[in-house]
Amino acid sequence: MDPLGLPFEMYNHAGLFRTTEFDKPVDTTGEIIDSGDPNLDGPVENAIDMIGKLAESERVEQVFIRHAFRFWMGRNETLNDAPVLQAAHKAYRENNGSMKALITSLVTSNAFVYRTVND
């Protein structure tokens, strides 16, 4: 399994917590590598540790905002979308990680309201 998958071995196929499998301890150690954020990269003890590191990362937050943009706009972002992404990130942050604030920021932006049609 990959270094990001091993931490989730602490849960079985049904999502139940476990410490052993066939009477042997489950290895839940993993590693975040090549994330683009040196503070994020490194070993993790288990899924909880990994989730904590991801939750504290501004880079992960920015990736989340970018993926929300792609979903709601139905397209990939361009350089011209930087102000929309920055405003969405600001709304998300200022509202304590509110998905509602993020979506509202995106769907009220000019990029969403004034779409162009390609022939």
Please name every model-derived segment.
Residues 72-76:
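Core structural elements
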Residues 1-59, 65-69, 82-94, 104-119:
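Active-site substrate-binding loop specific to GH73 endo-beta-N-acetylglucosaminidase modules
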